[in-house]
Amino acid sequence: ALAGLAFAQVESVNIVGYTTTQISSATWYQIAPTFIPVGGIPEDGMPINDLFTTGFAAGDVLYVWNQTSQSYDFYTWMDEPFDPDYNVLPAGWADSTEIRTEAVLKAGQAVFLRKASAGATSVVFAGQVEGGIVTTVPSATWVQVSLPYPIDVALNDEIAWTGFAAGDAIYVWNATTQ
């Protein structure tokens, strides 16, 4: 009965997927995207306003570590942020001047998120899994990172820590004690 049917082999050059994190109200989270844009490269990053999209309201905040200034860039959710010409844009994350941000996060670039508004939401990261992502830590600086893969690993078992010396430190966010 199947004679004469042709079957095509399907191949893909990329592996795509998604992860979902439940976000409760009045709680701090350290969270990071674990994917790159489909068909993209790790350096592209993903826009903050494409990553954290629904279930947020005025008062919710996002802190992104700025490697250059060694301080946090602060964003707040706005129902009607502006563009540089002060045209009203769709709801999203905006900087202190109320301009909708175009900032991007790379896979493994962690941020602090606090949902101050009532009600829980879900953050869904979707994209392409990229192998071989490397996080570079310049000398005498801080970097806020997360594992760039959506899996749990032991700190000293599956992470290649290279180039570190006595006195270097790592701090791990404890979600329970905040």
Report each predicted region and the residues it spans:
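Fold-core signature of tandem repeat domains
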Residues: 62-64, 113, 170-173
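A cross-kingdom feature marking solvent-exposed beta-strand/loop segments within repeated
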Residues: 69-107
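Short, intrinsically disordered, charge-balanced linker/junction segments flanking boundaries
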Residues: 176-178
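Intrinsically disordered, low-complexity segments enriched in small/polar residues
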Residues: 16, 61, 70-75, 84, ...
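A short, polar beta-strand/turn micro-motif
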Residues: 6-58, 67, 99-166
